[in-house]
Structures are given as structure tokens and as C-alpha cells.
């Protein structure tokens, strides 16, 4: 038993070190969302007070998180966690980040720590969510993101944060759009939303792997409709910017276009930016030819557009 414990601990440490190797900026804190595991109905407790909610149910995955050579984290179950990054001088904004990965892993480097690197240099605090993989339990990723909001709202004043938005990429964009439309109260409602090449619909135009991994290979008509998030946009959906490429061969651009049309019908302010090229998965890298960076000379435009939009949201503070 003791040997098994040591082997398990070493595996977890190795996975953690692998993730750290891909981080451009070290988080100020890393917190497990369910410190006592998924089998206990508790989230994060501080000074005897429950700050977040319990896990709903276990997702059935066991063992340590896995990390591949690109820094993508998989097999996330008991070890779901959040990385918190607080800039030296916070400008009042914070973003909860949902990396993509088709609901089978989290792109923790290109769509996580690289986001934190860019944001903290602008004075924006960041919470990267390494959420549980559904594994047949479709409610769990959203519970994890909502718990991240609960934790960040609780500590916002001490961090100098007045506004908390959400950002997501690909399947993480589906999760961020879920957070933007399926929130349960003011605490879990994002103040703004950034969706980057997001999966939106689970109808014909969907990304097949994302849909199967969240709601299964033979989903009910109810689940398909419910998780097609163009159907969930309302007047209470936060203002949103969508950014993607016209030649995205993985996630049809109509996903974003249909979400934007739903926003227009409901009177939700927002912007839609479609770059000429770039494909899918270009993330937040600032290193030329790193990862799947296909934006080329449009990369500077992407950062300028997003930076301006975020600055404009901050003017309301």
C-alpha cells in the first residue's frame, strides 16, 4: 500500500512538473477545486466557510492528470484545479479562462498560461480552469467553471478586481458560452465574454468530438437543443466578442455567426471578427511558428482588437 502511494505521488508530481515546464508565467496560487476528492460533497472551504460548491458527482476518472508533449492536460478528475495569476498592479479586470481540447483534455499552455502571460502584462488578473473531463457526466465542466467564479468573486476585493469575465477556446469556447448563458445567479454570471473559435452548436454544424465527449454518441434531442448555445442566448447574456478564422476546418465559422445572430436578436452588445486565415487552434502564442499559429501577420491585429475591446469594458468600472 505504501509503495502504491509513493508511486501515485511521484506520478502526480511528474505531471505537475510537466505542466510547469509549459508555463510562461508562474501562477500566484494553484488550488484544487475539490480538495477532498469528487466523492465528498465539498468544494473549497476557508476558515470554516464553504467558498464553492461540491462536485455534483464523480466523473469516473482515476489516477493523476496526464500531460502530453504540447502541455495538454488530460484525465482530469479528482485533480481538477485553478491557477490564479494576480498582476503587480491590477487594472480591475479578471478573466476566467477555459482552455480548449474537445472535452477530452485542456490546452493548458497555448490557451492557458500564454493567456495569463499576455493578460497580466496588461494588468488583468487571470484564473485558468483545468476543469474535469465529462466522461459521461455533462454537467461537470460547467460546475467547475462556476466554482471558479465563486472563488474569484469571494476574493475579488483583496485582489483589486471589480469585473470578472470569461474567455474560452474551441470546446473551451463552448464551456465559456455555457457560463455566459446557463449561469445560476449574479455570482456565476460573467461580466463579459470572449469566445475564440468556439464550438457553439451541437446540431449539424458541430465539432463531432466535442459533442460526443460532452453528451455522448447517441444524445437525446433535448440535450442537443439544450447544449446548442445559440438557443440559450437571452437579454441577460453578457456582452461578447467572438474571434475566429474564415478557414477554420475544425469548427465551422457558422457556429460563431449563429451565436452572434442570436445576440443581435436579444439585444446583446458585441463584436464578431473573422480573420481571413489562421485555421483552428492558434491560441495566444506570441512566439512565431509556435503551436498551431496560423494567423501570421494578423496576430498583431488580434491582440490590438482584443486589447481595445477589453479596455472599453473597463471604462464602466
Predicted regions, residues:
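Short beta-strand/loop motif that positions the catalytic acidic residue
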Residues: 236, 241-244, 248
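Catalytic nucleophile-loop/oxyanion-hole region of alpha/beta-hydrolase
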Residues: 107-115, 128-163, 294-299
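Mobile cap/lid helix-loop segments that gate and shape the active-site cleft of serine hydrolases
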Residues: 60-66, 198-232
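Conserved alpha/beta-hydrolase "acid-adjacent" motif
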Residues: 249-258
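Primarily recognizes the serine-hydrolase "nucleophile elbow" in alpha/beta-hydrolase
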Residues: 147-210, 224
